[in-house]
């Protein structure tokens, strides 16, 4: 049978679509500066998927459609690195970094040496090879001589280009990491599913890259920074700083905070700056990598068998504290998982007072040998979540008590157990446990979802305990009489305010409602993708697995979770109740261009907006919002008690405005473009 002939125009369209999609991936994932809407991007991707299905002969390893995952691998091949991937020597103090500088200058016989200071990303080292500009290999560091071929998983990392912007043959190196928000989402999800959480973002990224199911890797949204060119002399590069600019030109994501330092004192100043500013970032950093800038100097300095002599890791101080376990309480999650929580003697840690720490599950307690009364070391996983890293048995008095799993649910008294023998978590098996409903309600009314401030934790507990709410939709059927039954502390004015907030919540954007439903694996970002794509909750509920998995940003694992959620008859019943109550189940899309083309950052506390609200407001008016101030920032909005962004904006001469000046600025621009400013302020929260 002869091969069928593919029309020339189809081949040309496929190639054009791939180039266009990769360009928009670069704008979105690398530059964080998209130039088309998500809907337009989806349209391009759907067309490419359609053509590749019709003509599977045209599918290539570097096609954007290969990023979504779906393959199940048998294992990972071992590959030898072309040049060893060495580790770095570490230092934690200024004296040792000054000694490093003295050694470098002595060996080079130079009075001063230029350095490049780069943030040390807490992720997984990766080597990437390209032939004629096309991705051919992604390998882990391994033992430095040999690593594992994780190419299929690397393809799911959207900031890593599958085609370079120049047709070069090259090997580069960098770090694959898990963003802070994704790490928190993943651990919350794992605890709800009864799985052990990851200890830190680095472990999460490493564990994800070694998954055999590429769809699962795609669902976890890893990211990357590239910082090293192997054999830079082949490309006419003379310094590390030139190499970073070259990597940007090729289309790689390069950390924007790297700095060229004229001497070691500028390196120390950079280290001090980021020691204080690191929490502004959406990824975890544990120090600064200091590199001699000139490659000819690097060659003179050479390396030992383990580490280069021309670079060093200048680590930030470890953020750990010692405290004591006073007691252990048990929380019941939305899916019934029982999570032990350590009640601690209050201790200062990473800028906050820590009184509680998750113990994750009873297997974790057994492995760490943690007991009530123990002295323990506590740290913040990924700089966010307090957790106990080890107990100190040497300080035991003999009065400590072992922590044993409960034999019944601490809330409803129902049976507890595991859904399957391999599960780590213990769950409440009672489908009517009020604790599950309470957690689901807290998710629904949270600020990220329907934002019903009057329905706080205590009031939700009282409503459920009184039998006034049986499922999450019952919130929208509450009456003044229901609330009055709750007794003292709920006056007429409070009742009216709560009911008004509930009424306003019915008009929230669809993505807020989707977030509030608590669908496993669906956070705020995925909720926005679903709302923009389907435009109604009922359309999402009716969507097939095949339709969902092909949507960029969804993929097979999330698609499976969504289908299973809406397959439940109870979910359908809740949707029907929401509809009858007048909750908005369709998206009202409003996009304005009042601030289009402008980049804003925000610092301090504002009077009229929370941090989440001001970001949402700016984006709805067409602005781009960034986490840190750079020369590309147009305006910094300054509230009360501003942070380090204020000083940086002054240094860079970035324009600053108060909240009042900002609103006046918006008013004038709105009027120039023919919009009613007062109407915008009244209704912007209802837009999508």
From Swiss-Prot:
Its cofactor is Mg(2+); Mn(2+). GO terms for biological process: DNA repair; DNA replication. NAD(+) binds at residues 38-42, 87-88, 118, 141, 175, 291, 315. It catalyses: NAD(+) + (deoxyribonucleotide)n-3'-hydroxyl + 5'-phospho-(deoxyribonucleotide)m = (deoxyribonucleotide)n+m + AMP + beta-nicotinamide D-nucleotide. Residues 590-679 form the BRCT domain. It holds the Pfam family HHH_5. InterPro entries: BRCT_dom, BRCT_dom_sf, DisA/LigA_HHH, DNA_ligase, DNA_ligase_AS, DNA_ligase_CS, DNAligase_adenylation, DNAligase_N. It is an enzyme of class 6 (ligase). The active site is at 120 (n6-amp-lysine intermediate). Its EC number is 6.5.1.2. Keywords: DNA damage, DNA repair, DNA replication, Ligase, Magnesium, Manganese, Metal-binding, NAD, Zinc. One of its GO terms (molecular function) is DNA binding. Zn(2+) binds at residues 409, 412, 428, 433. Coiled coil: none annotated. One of its GO terms (cellular component) is cytosol. DNA ligase that catalyzes the formation of phosphodiester linkages between 5'-phosphoryl and 3'-hydroxyl groups in double-stranded DNA using NAD as a coenzyme and as the energy source for the reaction. It is essential for DNA replication and repair of damaged DNA. Belongs to the NAD-dependent DNA ligase family. LigA subfamily. This is DNA ligase. The lineage of its organism: Bacteria, Thermotogati, Thermotogota, Thermotogae, Thermotogales.
